[in-house]
Amino acid sequence: MGIFQHIGGPAIVIFIGVMISACGAIWAAWEQSVSESVLRTKSEEIASLNKKIADSIIGGDSFAYITPTFFKDKSSPPYLTLVHQGEHPIYDLSIRVVDLDVFERQVKEGYTIADLHKKENQFNVGNLSTSQASMLGPISIPKNGIRLNIFFSARNGFFSESLRVRKVNDEWKTAIKVENTPTSGEVKLLYEKIDIDFPLNKKGDVEW
């Protein structure tokens, strides 16, 4: 008797055929899985590259804030200093600075909206490189301190800053809070810096 008759004859041939088909199906499935994985990886790489290109053109999540710079020479006025934050340059940056004490006094005195805008300090900065700081100009701070609300407009969107300066033990202390200004969705805190000993209210918070 032949070998196939000893081990089952046609049955073994069928079995071998089934095994070959199964192996072929497994191989095809593996190849498809690998192919899909490669395509998914390539798609993610392309999406990541496109985002990097867009961020480099628009400015990504970069923002800026303003802080007062004080000098050892007391006769020199403090300067408002613009500071860049983020991985990408900021493009087409313009800034509007509102002194809240002046604004509230002018509102009580009946100033018109046009008059109020004339009293605001505005800066057309243009482009701001990464890690760049730029002095915008001197500022006069009253003895009781100053409250500034600062509004930024750039190619990558809008953001705003609350800047508070108070004198403590003959030293100026600063509190800064920067938030995005989305057209929709929730406001997000971008940056916050509060000097040690800055005056706080009874709840332990800054009076923003």
Regions found by a protein language model. Name each.
Residues S33-E36, F103-G157:
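Intrinsically disordered, low-complexity Pro/Gly/Ser/Thr-rich segments with frequent PxxP/GP/PP motifs
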Residues M1-V13:
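N-terminal positive-inside, membrane-proximal cytosolic segments immediately preceding the first
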Residues H88-V97, Q106:
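Short, hydrophobic/aromatic beta-strand segments
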Residues I14-Q85:
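Membrane-proximal alpha-helical anchors
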Residues I66-K74, L82-G86, Y111-Q122, G126-N127:
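Terminal, low-complexity, charged helical segments
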Residues S76, P89-Y91, N144-I146, F159:
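Short loop/turn segments at connectors of secondary-structure elements within structured domains
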Residues F158-W208:
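Acidic, serine/threonine- and proline-rich intrinsically disordered appendage/tail regions
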